[in-house]
Structure formats: structure tokens, C-alpha cells
């Protein structure tokens, strides 16, 4: 499921992030990937051990926890903590698929079900830099307002087109969902949204209760926790 989630961060939060990130020390993004990835990846990244990365990442995780649409769509179980990258001067990342299993700092492993990009630059701040996500329906071009999030299956082939002017700053991270199957997650998300709309429009209370029970029974059947 490819989903645009607006306003994860407020305009004030984005401005604070940018002020601090613009003054940060960035490293070559190729240092964070293997040989094959390094051939396609040309960007800068905030070092993994950076206190700023950890601090800003925590702010993002708190914002996600408060966002009902994100929770409904992702059904998050674990996160690989947010990281930060910057593309400028022709920086790009060719077509690739994210790794299936990632190591967490506590020694646990995370299965990458959902890939997330949180845009921190406004579209008019840079040229190029579109996130291209390829799936069975074709290629989808993504370039969102600062503070907005795109989520998509980690199994998707994707790339970042060259940034030919300005700088594209973003946060990116991965989620292991309680429901690993993307089709099942989408069905649950659609059902949850329908139930909420029925509640808001004064739908039949008994029918809403029954549908809510169906939702939770499906989640119980499909979830891995």
C-alpha cells in the first residue's frame, strides 16, 4: 500500500529540524551500504552515532505514535530508528530494494515490511529528487510538502532521481508491522477507516459494533506479536 500521510511534523518542527540539520556534519551515504548499494547511492547521511540523529528521531517516533492514520495503516510493531539524508549537486540513489532483515541496536532484528520517507524540504527548495516507487501498477512519482510522510511496501523497487539544484533533506526509516502481508494490512486499514466514518455519520450502532468485532478478529488471526 502506497499512502501519503500529511502533517506528521508541524511547520515549526520542520523549521527547527532544518536549522539544526543544516548545521550538522554529514558523511558519505555510501558508507552505510554494501558494495552493490554503494554503486547506486550518491548522497550524504547523518552519522548513525550522531546525538542529533537520535534526538530528532525520537521526536519523529513520538509524532508517529500520536498520528491515528499512521497507526491504522502501518500497525507498527518495531521501528528501525529514523535516519536522515541529504541529496544535492546531482546526488541520486538508483533503483534498489531495501534489505529484508535489519539489525537493531539492542541486538534484535527487524523484518522490513514498510519503508517510510518523511520529507523535510519543501518541493520548491530543490529540483529533481523525486522518489520513484515501482509496483505492479507502474511507477509512482512522489515529491511531498515538508512534514509529510510517504509509506510503501519495503518489497518495492524504488529510486531517488538526481537533485540538480538545491538540496533535498529527508528522514527515512523502516517498520516491522504486526501484519506482515501488505494486502491484509490494506484490508484492515480500509475496514478501520470505514468503521470510523460510520461512527462519525451516526451509522447503525449494532452494525458498527459487529464490524469492529470483525476487524479485531481479523487482526487477531493475521497479527504476529
Swiss-Prot record:
GO molecular function: 2-oxoglutarate-dependent dioxygenase activity; iron ion binding; L-ascorbic acid binding
Residues bound to 2-oxoglutarate: 168
Entry-linked PROSITE patterns: FE2OG_OXY (PS51471)
Pfam family, one: 2OG-FeII_Oxy_3
Enzyme class of the recorded protein, top EC level: oxidoreductase
Residues that span the membrane, as ranges: none
EC number annotated for this UniProt entry: 1.14.11.-
Keyword field contains Metal-binding: yes
Cofactor detail note: Binds 1 Fe(2+) ion per subunit.
Gene3D superfamilies: q2cbj1_9rhob like domain, Rabenosyn, Rab binding domain
Binding site for Fe cation: 96, 98, 158
Annotated keywords: Dioxygenase, Iron, Metal-binding, Oxidoreductase, Vitamin C
Domain Fe2OG dioxygenase: 78-177
UniProt keyword Metal-binding, yes or no: yes
Requisite cofactors: Fe(2+); L-ascorbate
NCBIfam families tied to this protein: PRK05467.1-3 (NF003974), PRK05467.1-4 (NF003975)
Protein known as: PKHD-type hydroxylase Smal_0990
Species per Swiss-Prot/TrEMBL record: Stenotrophomonas maltophilia (strain R551-3)
Amino acid at each position: 500500500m502506497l499512502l501519503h500521510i500529511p502533517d506528521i511534523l508541524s511547520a515549526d518542527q520542520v523549521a527547527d529540524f532544518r536549522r539544526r540539520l543544516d548545521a550538522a556534519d554529514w558523511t558519505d551515504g555510501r558508507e552505510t551500504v554494501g558494495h552493490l548499494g554503494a554503486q547506486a547511492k550518491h548522497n550524504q547521511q547523518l552519522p548513525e552515532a550522531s546525538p542529533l540523529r537520535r534526538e530528532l528521531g525520537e521526536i519523529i517516533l513520538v509524532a508517529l505514535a500520536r498520528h491515528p492514520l499512521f497507526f491504522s495503516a502501518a500497525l507498527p510493531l518495531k521501528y528501525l530508528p529514523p535516519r536522515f539524508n541529504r541529496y544535492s549537486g546531482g546526488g541520486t540513489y538508483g533503483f534498489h530494494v531495501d534489505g529484508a532483515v535489519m539489525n537493531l541496536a539492542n541486538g534484535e532484528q527487524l523484518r522490513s515490511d514498510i519503508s517510510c520517507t518523511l520529507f523535510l524540504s519543501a518541493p520548491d527548495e530543490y529540483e529533481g529528487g523525486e522518489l520513484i516507487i515501482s509496483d505492479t501498477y507502474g511507477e509512482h512519482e512522489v515529491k511531498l510538502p515538508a512534514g509529510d510522510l510517504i509509506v510503501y511496501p519495503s518489497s518495492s523497487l524504488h529510486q531517488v532521481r538526481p537533485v540538480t539544484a538545491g538540496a533535498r533533506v529527508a528522514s527515512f526509516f523502516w517498520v516491522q508491522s504486526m501484519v506482515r502481508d501488505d494486502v491484509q494490512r490494506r484490508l484492515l486499514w480500509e475496514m478501520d477507516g470505514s468503521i470510523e466514518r460510520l461512527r462519525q455519520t451516526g451509522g447503525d450502532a449494532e452494525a458498527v459494533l459487529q464490524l469492529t468485532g470483525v476487524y479485531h478478529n481479523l487482526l487477531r488471526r493475521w497479527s504476529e506479536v
